[in-house]
Design a protein with these regions (language model features):
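Acidic, Ala/Val/Gly-enriched low-complexity intrinsically disordered segments
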Residues: 2-7
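Charge-rich amphipathic alpha-helical interaction elements
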Residues: 8, 12-156
Length: 156
């Protein structure tokens, strides 16, 4: 799926590729143990940054789901022979498909597949950002444990 969707998320109205997002998270979540006080202060900023991204991608995911439903309905009507005559003049479809076989045509439809891939891709981005936000929420706990470990090592 990544190969098909290796196009940037900008293609889907987003701002970066998923790979770019992974790299940015790797950089942002790295804790510099020589400046734990500054790292602790950075936590709310990181949370805000990724919460904004999560919100943006969640809205895009919702829109992608709605777009998929719209395309699905249009294609279902098309393959069931229920579309307007103009649709068939523009894009003829002379087969009579049994209702039990419509799903075969829907599953193989390129436009519907693309809408589904977009939806799934954005879903994965949202899931990833949810996990990133959880990790950011645990960041201060990790910093606190690092400070306590350093105190223990130095006999304090």
């Amino acid at each position: 799926m990544e190969g098909v969707l290796a196009a940037s998320l900008f293609y889907y109205g987003c701002i970066m590729t998923l790979e770019d997002l992974h790299k940015q998270v790797d950089l942002d979540l790295k804790i510099d143990d020589t400046e734990l006080d500054l790292e602790s202060i950075r936590t709310p900023q990181l949370h805000n940054k990724y919460l904004k991204l999560y919100t943006k991608f969640s809205l895009q995911y919702k829109k992608a789901k709605d777009d998929y439903s719209t395309v699905y309905k249009f294609k279902w009507e098309y393959y069931c022979g229920k579309s307007a005559p103009e649709v068939y003049q523009e894009n003829p479809f002379d087969l009579k498909v049994l209702k039990s076989d419509v799903y075969i045509y829907l599953n193989a439809d390129a436009e519907l597949q693309q809408a589904d891939q977009k939806q799934e891709y954005l879903k994965q981005v949202c899931n990833y950002l949810e996990r990133v936000l959880r990790e950011i929420n645990n960041r201060n706990w990790n910093i606190k444990n690092t400070i306590e470990w350093k105190k223990f090592i130095h006999g304090e």
